[in-house]
């Protein structure tokens, strides 16, 4: 599962599917499969703007798809949001998938990895806030020391 989350699309694939998508769009109608393939590539990009664009395309597809297609759309919506560190949204999608398919092992593993990332980022966030608080307290102490010495 971690391989799926960390996999990057090749530039060649991204360009190939973008060209196909743009060609169909210019002709007036993009097929669901073409839109999904392009979105799937975008979600695996190393650029956050591409990932966001892929998420938008997947969200557009969601109401149009069959049950099987929706499962894929929701899964990659969770993956895209995970890659953007939008863990709450990623969890929303993966838990929705687990409601309809409680035995889906891929979704269970993705949920576990999202929870793990949230805990890790939460701890890192707390450490940063704690470090900033110590820095402010230290600075206040130095200012207090300087003021008391200047009065002496």
Curated annotation (Swiss-Prot):
PANTHER family: MITOCHONDRIAL FISSION 1 PROTEIN, TETRATRICOPEPTIDE REPEAT PROTEIN 11 TPR REPEAT PROTEIN 11
GO annotation (BP), single: negative regulation of fatty acid transport
Gene field: FIS1
Residues in TPR repeats: 71-104
Protein's name in the database: Mitochondrial fission 1 protein
Keyword annotations from UniProtKB, A to Z: Acetylation, Apoptosis, Membrane, Mitochondrion, Mitochondrion outer membrane, Peroxisome, Phosphoprotein, TPR repeat, Transmembrane, Transmembrane helix, Ubl conjugation
Organism field: Homo sapiens (Human)
Domain topic, free-text comment: The C-terminus is required for mitochondrial or peroxisomal localization, while the N-terminus is necessary for mitochondrial or peroxisomal fission, localization and regulation of the interaction with DNM1L.
Function: Involved in the fragmentation of the mitochondrial network and its perinuclear clustering. Plays a minor role in the recruitment and association of the fission mediator dynamin-related protein 1 (DNM1L) to the mitochondrial surface and mitochondrial fission. May not be essential for the assembly of functional fission complexes and the subsequent membrane scission event. Also mediates peroxisomal fission. May act when the products of fission are directed toward mitochondrial homeostasis, mitophagy, or apoptosis.
Alphabetical list of CDD domains matching this protein: Fis1 (cd12212)
Top-level taxon of origin: Eukaryota
Modified positions (N-acetylmethionine) in chain numbering: 1
Self-association state and partner proteins as the record states: Interacts with DNM1L/DLP1 through the TPR region; may form part of a larger protein complex at the endoplasmic reticulum-mitochondrial interface during mitochondrial fission. Interacts with MARCHF5. Interacts with MIEF1. Interacts with PEX11A, PEX11B and PEX11G.
Phosphoserine: residues carrying this PTM: 10
């Amino acid at each position: 599962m971690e391989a799926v989350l960390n996999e990057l699309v090749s530039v060649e694939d991204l360009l190939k599917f973008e060209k196909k998508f743009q060609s169909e769009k210019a002709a007036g109608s993009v097929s669901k499969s073409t839109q999904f393939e392009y979105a799937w590539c975008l979600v695996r990009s190393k650029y956050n703007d591409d990932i966001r664009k892929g998420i938008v395309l997947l969200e557009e597809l969601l109401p149009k798809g069959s049950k099987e297609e929706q499962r894929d759309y929701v899964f990659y919506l969770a993956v895209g949001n995970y890659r953007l560190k939008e863990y709450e949204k990623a969890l929303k999608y993966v838990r929705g998938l687990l409601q309809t398919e409680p035995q889906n092992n891929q979704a269970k593993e993705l949920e576990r990895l999202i929870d793990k990332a949230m805990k890790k980022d939460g701890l890192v966030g707390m450490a940063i806030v704690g470090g900033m608080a110590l820095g402010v307290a230290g600075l206040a102490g130095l200012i207090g020391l300087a003021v008391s010495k200047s009065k002496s």
